[in-house]
Amino acid sequence: MSRIATTFANLAKQNEKALVTFITAGDPDLETTEKLILELEKSGADLIELGVPFSDPMADGPTIQLSSERALCAGTTLPKILTLVKSVRQQTEIPLILMGYYNPVFLYGIERFVADAVSAGVDGVLLVDLPPEEAEEFKAAADREGLDVIFLLTPTSDEARIRKVANLGSGFIYYVSVTGVTGARTSVADTVFPDVKKIREHVTLPLVVGFGISDPVQAGRVAAVADGVVVGSALVKLFEEFRGDELRERLGGFVAALKAGVKAVGG
């Protein structure tokens, strides 16, 4: 059983939901990212998504776009991120998911990327611009190496798309709660709750909800109906204001509060 599957199974046994946290790898630098991964885990994160910075992040709002720019300016590359994962994997067993765009993976070479990612200790990959209809080659390579491939569903996904993602994906399914780009929002769309119910009729994989969740109350509301919640932009926003120990402490405190919000709802 993969680290991702094991984590969700263990949480289910404890009647808990998953807190999935997102930060951009290399913002402000890769050395800091390694320390923050350990801080996120210590503070209550159950899974961690590492954003792979890209020069044309079409699905991302301004907060994560700026974070990607800072990481790219610091010299962050996909090979360096894999080296980071290999280093941090010696210190933790928390599931690590690379989230980004297909172009850097394609340029790296699909077979080579998958092999190197698994060797480094990556558990899953989510490529936001690789739809299931075009993912056959990547999915086949990932399946051979035991790498989970995570796909997105959105409020506009019809029943056929839901079935396709349910059949093709592994690890978990990521439901994007709003149309548009990433970014913290002041409330959770009411449509999330019936949408999640509809998706659950067709999927057996864990279902996590992200995009726009920005505080413990929102996280708790969504966790009440999903298997997990993803918080990204609200965390990445802290990187604009803080550095060093203060960034680590602020990030840790916020994640602890988010986890408390998620745990408050139970299973």
From Swiss-Prot:
- Which residue spans traverse the membrane? none
Q: Where is the active site?
A: 49 (proton acceptor), 60 (proton acceptor)
Q: Kind of enzyme, top EC level?
A: lyase
* UniProt pathway: Amino-acid biosynthesis; L-tryptophan biosynthesis; L-tryptophan from chorismate: step 5/5
Catalysed reactions, semicolon-separated: (1S,2R)-1-C-(indol-3-yl)glycerol 3-phosphate + L-serine = D-glyceraldehyde 3-phosphate + L-tryptophan + H2O
User: What does the record give as EC number?
Assistant: 4.2.1.20
Segment forming the signal sequence: none
The UniProt entry, under InterPro entries, shows:
Aldolase_TIM, RibuloseP-bd_barrel, Trp_synthase_alpha_AS, Trp_synthase_suA
A single Gene Ontology CC term: cytosol
- Tell me which UniProt keywords the record has, alphabetically: Amino-acid biosynthesis, Aromatic amino acid biosynthesis, Lyase, Tryptophan biosynthesis
Q: Does the keyword Amino-acid biosynthesis apply?
A: yes
One GO MF annotation is:
tryptophan synthase activity
Q: How does it assemble?
A: Tetramer of two alpha and two beta chains.
Q: Outline what the protein does.
A: The alpha subunit is responsible for the aldol cleavage of indoleglycerol phosphate to indole and glyceraldehyde 3-phosphate.
Q: What protein family does this chain belong to? A: Belongs to the TrpA family.
Question: What is this protein called in UniProt?
Answer: Tryptophan synthase alpha chain
